Amino acid sequence: MKTITAGLAALLLSTAASFAADAWKEAEVNGAKIYTDANGMTLYTYDKDEKGKSNCYDKCATNWPPLKAEAGAKADDEWSVVDRTDGTKMWAYDGKPVYTFIKDKKPGDVTGDGVGEVWHIVKA
């Protein structure tokens, strides 16, 4: 029974770690190393957010979809999970929630960088 319990615990830990590893990746765009979501879409931070707290909801979140964290997702190095007021969870890099941008149409697009002087690419 101990072997089964230990095996199950190891499986659960590896599954949680894989959620983290599958949520984002490093990419090189225009000679710069950045973070993207699993589909290669550029990730951004929002100056109006606080560490560990998203302030992007409603229309903001429609235009800047949060990088959602799966149930059971765990922090990984500089990455953490933020609870949103709508009950969902999202990823944060160095404590800052991260988002994609609706106007980025294909991997490598960086059209959200500098929008309103408050959106910035997450650099790796």
Language-model features, listed with the residues they occupy:
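Bacterial N-terminal signal peptides
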Residues: 7-15
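Low-complexity intrinsically disordered segments
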Residues: 1-2, 12
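Compact beta-sheet-dominated domain cores in extracellular/mature segments
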Residues: 2-7, 19-124
